[in-house]
Amino acid sequence: MGNEEISDFEKQRLANIAERDALLKQLSLNAQSVFTPTLPNRATGSQAKTKKKPAPKKVKKEEESPAPRRMSSRLRGIAADSEVAKRKAEEQHQAYQEAERAKRVRKSDSFSLNDIFVSGQKLSGDGLLGVDVVTKGVAVPYQRTFGDDDIKKTTDKELKALRKEMSELQLWEAWEPNRIKLTPERVYTMTFHPSETKPLIFAGDKMGHLGILDASQEKPTSVKQEDEDEEDDDPDPVLTTLKPHTRTISSMVIHPSKPTHLYTASYDSSIREMDLDKTTSVERYAPDSTSDDVPLSGLDMAADDPNTLYWTTLEGEFGRYDMRTPKQGSVAVWSLSEKKIGGFSLFPTHSHYFATASLDRTMRLWDIRKLSRREPVPVGEHQSRLSVSHAAFNSAGQVATSSYDDSLKLYDFGAKGIASWKPGHTLSDAEMKPDTVVRHNCQTGRWVTILRPQWQINPQSHIQRFCIGNMNRFVDVYSSSGDQLAQLGGDGITAVPAVAVFHRSKNWIAGGTASGKICLWM
């Protein structure tokens, strides 16, 4: 009988006993750790003599309500599987959900920038002023796809001169990119201040932080004392980090006629205005209730109107609001897509036209003058094989889009006479086909911000140009005809500068990475 195999029931019973004993042992150890004080270890003589490094400067964080602490039911005297235990678990889960929900509720109040200050230097008012590509791309870090040989082979003199000029842009020498951490989290959007006297960069991240960097600063030179650590002799750049939003800052704009005002749009459903002179931040637009969740995906302003905001949402909506009027009854909203609109832009010289890029794989051209609230009809649309991430208009009437089919598409509506179109003008499918298609790896994955083209608004020559991040850790510059002008890189770039922006008139280009760090070419 002793050699008989144990039945399945007996095996399960023994396994349950072993599991119970292990659990009781673990609970006993946990209880001992709660009530047993931990004595500090005494350092040996050699360790005690070691020079202590100065403690890092602590950044004052916003006070948060303490999260509910966990304690075992046994220590609380609650029997297992009892109604009290179930009620306790439900209360803990509800408290956690409420805490997470509170973090995401937007801040509707007006406040000074010191109220939303996170780290860095505090600001003062005078301190600032074809055919779709079928194959998927594979990123190869630091492998160039454009360089000096391409410039030498260029036969067009003007194009060759511009390629040489753009390729000679150099990384900011004061600090390497891996030292310039402008935001705590992944950069989602960036912009330059319009000023041509100094490069002033703004960056918004995934958690609602706003970073500000004055790149005209010079690296301080200091005489090292004998008792100073080596780290103290190499300070980081001076920058400022604020937190005006509770969720992702998706877009930002500074109107050239109001250079002291920065407008930011966020997934927390609000648009805020930051006054750089008065160092204040006020809410300019948001839904009536804080419980309304309408994440904003894009923001733009007409070149001839510094008072009207235009935006798009992840719900496929397009909105307009004149800040000089009461919000009640004056906000206009159109539903343009059943799926999210990832990006949009106004035609700078004729702002009643705008282009949208959507998850439904379309780039659509619209005319606000003929936009019906009930059934809005576009001027025309073009469908790609996969979703379209962004549609950017330039002053010549050309639109650049990026798409997950690994292509950049260029549409020349200026050549089709967009400036003279009458209200109600429409384009056929053939007229909406892109004039140029450029192969470009747009497979960003989960941890890299989506690649979006961005035009230089006022280029220094008649050749229009735009920049876009490159998955091989570069920033690419293209002309409106699809010719590559430069591939910018450099030492110290350890991640993809996915968010790339041009200064509106100077040949300054900035790139932001998933770690919140900045690259700057000038």
Curated annotation (Swiss-Prot):
User: What does the sequence similarity comment in the record state about its family?
Assistant: Belongs to the WD repeat DDB2/WDR76 family.
Query: What's an example GO BP annotation here?
Result: regulation of DNA damage checkpoint
Alphabetical UniProt keywords? DNA damage, DNA-binding, Repeat, WD repeat
**Top-level taxon of origin:** Eukaryota
Pfam families reported in the protein's UniProt record: WD40 (PF00400)
WD repeat segments: 182-223, 244-284, 294-331, 336-376, 381-422, 445-488, 491-522
One GO term in the molecular function aspect is: DNA binding
Composition-biased stretches, type Acidic residues, lie in 226-236
Protein name as it appears in the record: DNA damage-binding protein cmr1
Region Disordered, residue ranges: 34-89, 217-239
GO annotations of cellular component type: nucleus
**Which residue spans traverse the membrane?**
none
**Composition bias, kind Basic residues: at what positions?**
49-59
What role is this protein assigned? Answer: DNA-binding protein that binds to both single- and double-stranded DNA. Binds preferentially to UV-damaged DNA. May be involved in DNA-metabolic processes.
| Bias kind Polar residues: ranges | 34-47
